[in-house]
Each structure stands twice: as C-alpha cells, then as structure tokens.
C-alpha cells in the first residue's frame, strides 16, 4: 500500500507539471503540484503507512535536518531578493546593461550571461529568472530579435551559478544543512565546479546561437527608465549583503543560518514600515513582497519529507543508497541524482538524498551539482523550469517540452559531466 500511494503521487505530480501546472478556482490560480503531494502524504498517514510520532519527531528535531528550519531559511532569503526586485533594482541593472551593450547581439548575449550569473550568486535563481524573462521577451519583441538564445542563456546561467553559494538554491540549503556543511566549506568546494560548468555551458550556448547573434539590434528602441526609491534600495541592499556575510560566518559565531535569515527578513519589514511612515509613502512594497514569497514550497517540501520518511521506513532509501555507493560516488550520485530529479523534481530528490548514507562528502556535493544542473535538462527537473515555461506562454513564445529537453540535453549532459569531473579531481 505505501509504495502504491507513493508511486501514484509521483506520477500525478509529473503529469500535473506537464499537463496542468495550475488549477484555477474562481479568480485564484493555484499550482497543482503541491496539493497532489499533500494528498499523497495525508493518505500515507491515514493508512498508517508511517507512524505519526516519527513525523512529529522529524518536524520538531533540533538539528539541521529539520525541514521547517530549512524552509524558514529559504523563504526568508527569497523575501530579501523579492524586495530588491519590487524596488526595481534588477530591472534598473538590466536597463543599464542594455544601454551599454546595445547594437551588438554578441556583446548583449555575453553581457547578460555575466550579469545574470553574478546576480544569481548573491540572490536566488528563481527570482532572477522571474525578473529577467519578461524583460528579455519585451526587449526582443521591440528590437525585432529572436528571444530564444537569450532566454535559454538566462535559464542556464541562473541554474549553473545557483550552485556557487549555499543560498543560491533551496536544494543547496537542504542538502548542506542536512550534513552540517557551512558556508565557507561549501564555497571552497563548489566554486571551481561552478566555474568549469559555466565555461562549458556558455561555450555550448555560444556555438548553438553564434549565427543568430550576427543580426544587429534595432538601435532606435528606447528603454524605459526605472525609477528607484534610493532609501528603499539602501534598506534592501543592506539587509541582503549583511545577511549573506553573516551566513558566511554563521558556523564561527554559533548562530544557525535560519535564525539569521528570519531575523533580517523581519528587520527588513520593520525598517521598511518605519521608512514608509516617515516618508509618508504607501506600504505596497511590503505587501507585494510578501505576496510573491514561494509559500507553495511549504506544503510541497513537508509532504515530500513525509513521503521520503515512508520510503526510509520501508528500507527503500537505503537500497538506493547502497546501489549508488557501489561505484564511484561522484559520478553515481551526480548522474543518478540528475536522472531522479528529472523524474520527481529536484526538491523531492534532495529530500530523498538527504536521508541516504553517503560513502564520502564527495557524494553530497555531487548530489548538489545534480540538483542544480538537472533544472535545465527537462522542465520536470526544477520548479524554476515549470515557472519559466508557464511565463513564456504568457508572452506568446512557443517553446515546447520537446524543444526544452533537446537544448537541455545538448547543454546539460556535458556541463554535468564537466562539473562532476572537476569535483572528482579536487575532492
């Protein structure tokens, strides 16, 4: 019975991602993947497939594996990034880049890749993708250029450089926290595989699109100026930079990362409220920021955690772990992780792998690499892919599952192997 419920839940989640990503109830659109996972988890509880005390112990545990702490960390960090987006910081930076690079598609292509890579390192891949995709679509339409090279480049850059720092992706946070890997240790290990992966992925991107980039950009297109409240910008940047620095030294000052991010996200709301009161401006930015936070991840991650606990309780997790540990852990966990992520999504894959027994620390880092690069192999690989495909439809850009996977396999497989080989050499 437990296996039947789990397999059915996973199949339905994949089908929802591919065929009905959103459910519309009156005027409210809800992502379909999390209610399915929630129903699956509830069925496991109702059929006594997993003891309730096991779940309570896991959710109240005072350790790094506690999924509630990890969710608080990620959502709090995302709020800091969303705030800067609402202020207009990312659009402002993008506009400045376009003005400097306008005229040459090749320069624009390279410049946007570098800019998106840089911003992703210190914020979140999901936020960067959601911010830059509308901008690229709008600019390409008005400049009469093909948006596909820039959109794919943006998506690849964001999901490659998201593995550079621990804060770049919820999967990084989850796996690192589960095995007590701190900010500095993570950075020391992952920076080189990230750089190599970036060089390989960008080289393939350039080879794929170099002919299309020879067309000149319509230089007469004027970019609309973005007005930014400097006070709000300073507040946002201060909180993001300070949080990142404190996360980097969290293990040395003995403060848990989730407490730092929660404290600064609350401080951001309080400081902004005080500033808005003094300046007599609307509180809209706070409400808009909080409204955009990825709350759907809460039921999804908690439900998948229950499903994985059931698999662990049934002995299936240890069987998969034993199988992957039989060969070289870097390549078995890296390739195996990417395959599993593209079957069940990278967040459930990370929850599953966090419950495994790793033969070495290399296995953990290989799993992190897999969880990031899996995002651009198929749309199923990550929530970012699902959101991105949905966003393209709203801008009437025809980019099918087949086309996504075709580009994803061409770029993703060499990039994954290059990153894993680098990890194998250095670790």
Where are the regions a protein language model picked out?
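Membrane-core helix-loop-helix motifs of multi-pass transport proteins
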Residues: 1, 139-212, 216-228, 234, ...
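Hydrophobic transmembrane alpha-helices of multi-pass small-molecule transporters
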Residues: 1-82, 86, 192-198, 202-313, ...
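Hydrophobic alpha-helical transmembrane segments
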Residues: 7-17, 53-54, 102, 131-147, ...
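Membrane-embedded alpha-helical segments and adjacent helix-loop junctions characteristic
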Residues: 56-145, 283, 296-360
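Helix-loop-helix module between adjacent transmembrane segments
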Residues: 77-85, 103-104, 115-125, 157-165, ...
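Hydrophobic residues within alpha-helical transmembrane segments
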Residues: 111, 115, 156, 191-192, ...
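Hydrophobic alpha-helical membrane segments of integral membrane proteins
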Residues: 125-132, 152-153, 260-263, 377, ...
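Alpha-helical transmembrane segments of multi-pass membrane proteins predominantly involved
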Residues: 129-130, 179-182, 365, 369, ...
């Amino acid at each position: 019975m437990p296996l039947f419920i789990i397999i059915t839940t996973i199949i339905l989640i994949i089908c929802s991602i591919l065929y009905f990503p959103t459910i519309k109830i009156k005027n409210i659109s809800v992502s379909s993947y999390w209610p399915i996972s929630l129903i699956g988890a509830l069925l496991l509880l109702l059929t006594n497939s997993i003891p309730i005390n096991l779940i309570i112990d896991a959710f109240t545990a005072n350790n790094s594996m506690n999924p509630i702490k990890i969710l608080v960390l990620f959502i709090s960090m995302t709020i800091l990034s969303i705030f800067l987006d609402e202020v207009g910081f990312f659009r402002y930076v993008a506009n400045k880049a376009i003005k400097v690079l306008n005229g040459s598609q090749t320069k624009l292509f390279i410049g946007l890749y570098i800019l998106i890579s840089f911003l992703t390192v210190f914020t979140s891949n999901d936020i960067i993708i959601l911010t830059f995709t509308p901008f690229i679509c709008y600019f390409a339409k008005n400049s009469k250029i093909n948006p596909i090279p820039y959109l794919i480049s943006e998506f690849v850059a964001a999901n490659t450089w998201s593995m550079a720092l621990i804060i770049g992706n919820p999967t990084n946070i989850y796996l690192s926290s589960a095995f007590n890997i701190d900010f500095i240790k993570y950075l020391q290990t992952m920076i080189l595989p990230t750089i190599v992966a970036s060089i390989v992925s960008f080289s393939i991107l350039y080879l794929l699109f170099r002919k299309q980039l020879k067309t000149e950009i319509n230089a007469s297109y004027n970019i609309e100026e973005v007005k930014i409240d400097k006070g709000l910008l300073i507040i946002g940047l201060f909180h993001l930079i300070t949080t990142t620095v404190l996360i980097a030294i969290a293990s040395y000052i003995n403060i848990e990362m989730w407490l730092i991010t929660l404290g600064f996200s609350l401080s951001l709301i309080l400081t902004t409220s005080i500033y808005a009161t003094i300046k007599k401006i609307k509180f809209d930015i706070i409400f808009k920021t909080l409204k955009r936070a990825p709350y759907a991840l809460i039921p999804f991650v908690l439900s998948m955690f229950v499903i994985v606990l059931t698999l662990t309780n049934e002995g299936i997790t240890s069987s998969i772990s034993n199988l992957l540990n039989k060969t070289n852990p870097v390549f078995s966990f890296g390739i195996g992780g990417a395959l599993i992520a593209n079957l069940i999504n990278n967040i459930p894959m990370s929850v599953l792998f966090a419950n495994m027994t790793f033969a070495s620390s290399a296995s953990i880092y290989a799993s992190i690499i897999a969880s990031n690069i899996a995002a651009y192999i198929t749309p199923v690989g990550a929530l970012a892919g699902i959101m991105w495909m949905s966003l393209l439809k709203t801008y009437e850009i025809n980019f099918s599952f087949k086309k996504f996977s075709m580009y994803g396999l061409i770029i993703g497989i060499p990039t994954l192997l290059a990153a894993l080989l680098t990890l194998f050499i250095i670790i």
